[in-house]
């Protein structure tokens, strides 16, 4: 939702409170793909013979091992987090820093806030550096990754969180408002993911978590640009997950709903009541709750078999 991103506009909150989310009426069946692309619906076992006993035993042995025995655990992983100076990005940076990660805190304009985040991580006993840059620009992304590599020698996890809103109704939306949101929220994710994959492929290991939004799944009035970008992040991440799987690179998506922020705190009682009425759990989410999910996907051995998935953390809005 709009409240899950930096500096959202009130129009989206009003629209949701007034009209709610429209339920998708039908799901269209996709036409058959070109024959050059595998048709997964036709996959079948070529052999009528049962699996060999040795294969079954090998699978059983693997499942009996704990996740920590199957998956190599990285000590003090190096993490790059975009848009990490405030809000959800800040909560993620602090959670991963507290977990022992070495964190690069990216920011666009909030240098002072980013330094405070880095300071807090160091107070936890971790390591952190800051980097000011626009992730919609390839030169800035390359410089950011190089900064982390020069400092720590590797990059284990990338969290793409940076984003903006330029909310207005579709019929009033200027192309500049469309372009700005697509550039940062979608192209920025592409550039950072591409740069990260190049590094991770060499060592055959890595995790990428892209922060989307429940709006990317169900849309929202006044946010055509934002919905397009966040929906694109989900589809892009699924493709990246397929391409990175052979090199043990996991790519997943987190889709927050209404997350408590300075903006939600300023809403009147009537407006808040209407908004909460659209959330089955009846409350806003917390940035720390989103950070907890990201921490699991980024660090837990139990998440090693999860890739290409979009996780909603929205109080039930997208049910």
Curated annotation (Swiss-Prot):
Substrate binds at residue 213. It is found in: Plastid, Chloroplast; Plastid. Keywords: Acetylation, Chloroplast, Fatty acid biosynthesis, Fatty acid metabolism, Lipid biosynthesis, Lipid metabolism, NADP, Oxidoreductase, Plastid, Transit peptide. The active site is at residue 226. It is an enzyme of class 1 (oxidoreductase). NADP(+) binds at residues 81-105. It catalyses: a (3R)-hydroxyacyl-[ACP] + NADP(+) = a 3-oxoacyl-[ACP] + NADPH + H(+). This is 3-oxoacyl-[acyl-carrier-protein] reductase, chloroplastic. It comes from Arabidopsis thaliana.
């Amino acid at each position: 939702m709009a409240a899950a991103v930096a500096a959202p506009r009130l129009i989206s909150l009003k629209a949701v409170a007034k009209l709610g989310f429209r339920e998708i009426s039908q799901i269209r069946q996709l036409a058959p793909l070109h024959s050059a692309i595998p048709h997964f619906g036709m996959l079948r076992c070529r052999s009528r013979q049962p699996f060999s006993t040795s294969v079954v035993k090998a699978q059983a042995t693997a499942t009996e091992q704990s996740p920590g025995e199957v998956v190599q655990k990285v000590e003090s992983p190096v993490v790059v987090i975009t848009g990490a100076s405030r809000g959800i990005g800040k909560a993620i940076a602090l959670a991963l820093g507290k977990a022992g990660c070495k964190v690069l805190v990216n920011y666009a304009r909030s240098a002072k806030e980013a330094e405070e985040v880095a300071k807090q991580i160091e107070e936890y006993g971790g390591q952190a550096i800051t980097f000011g840059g626009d992730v919609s620009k390839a030169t800035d992304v390359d410089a950011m990754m190089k900064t982390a590599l020069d400092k720590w020698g590797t990059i284990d996890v990338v969290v793409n969180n940076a984003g903006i809103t330029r909310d207005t109704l579709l019929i009033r939306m200027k192309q500049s408002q469309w372009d700005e949101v697509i550039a940062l929220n979608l192209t920025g994710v592409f550039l950072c993911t591409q740069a990260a994959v190049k590094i991770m492929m060499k060592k055959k290991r890595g995790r990428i978590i892209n922060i989307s939004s429940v709006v990317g799944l169900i849309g929202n009035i006044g946010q055509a640009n934002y919905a397009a970008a966040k929906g694109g992040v989900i589809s892009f991440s699924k493709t990246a997950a397929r391409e990175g799987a052979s090199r043990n690179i996991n790519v997943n998506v987190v889709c927050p709903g209404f997350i408590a922020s300075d903006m939600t705190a300023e809403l009147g009682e009537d407006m808040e009541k209407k908004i909460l009425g659209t959330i089955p759990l009846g409350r806003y989410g917390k940035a720390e709750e989103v950070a907890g999910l990201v921490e699991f996907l980024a660090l837990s051995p139990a998440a090693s078999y999860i890739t290409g998935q979009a996780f909603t953390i929205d109080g039930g809005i997208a049910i």
